[in-house]
Amino acid sequence: MEYRRRSFLKSLSLGALFPWNILDNMFFLNPNANRLKEFYKKAIIIDGLIIPRGWNDESFQALDDSGYTGFSASLSSRNFQVAMSSLLEWNEKIKQNSNKLILANGSKDFFIAKMERKTAVLLGFQNATMIEKSTDNLDFLYKAGTRWIQLTYNQ
């Protein structure tokens, strides 16, 4: 048991240095690396924060290579108008790439994404400034796809 734990800890430190190659490098440390790769392929993997700017074909390829089931996209929250524009832009991006992406409105969408070999996108903000001074804006933001607001950089 101690050997496996140490191997796992070594592999974690390798992940910090070589995040894209961690699973390929683990066979040096763990004789059960193939089992780990299979587990990763079957698991629901969600990246908790992606800043979704400047997406192109390479971005989609990197996302596909990552094996992520979904991610939380942190959109621009400068004000209500900018936030709504960001939400509309990402809703359109998801529609235009429906062969790769689905809009995540709840946990079931991550399971659907996994089954359909797509990536679920959970839209949200790292700030609440886009609410401005009207809690009514929360309803509009929710209807447009907002599913999380993180109270981090409030001003």
Task: Pin down the residues of each PLM region.
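N-terminal hydrophobic targeting/anchoring segments and the immediately downstream early-domain regions
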Residues: 2-154
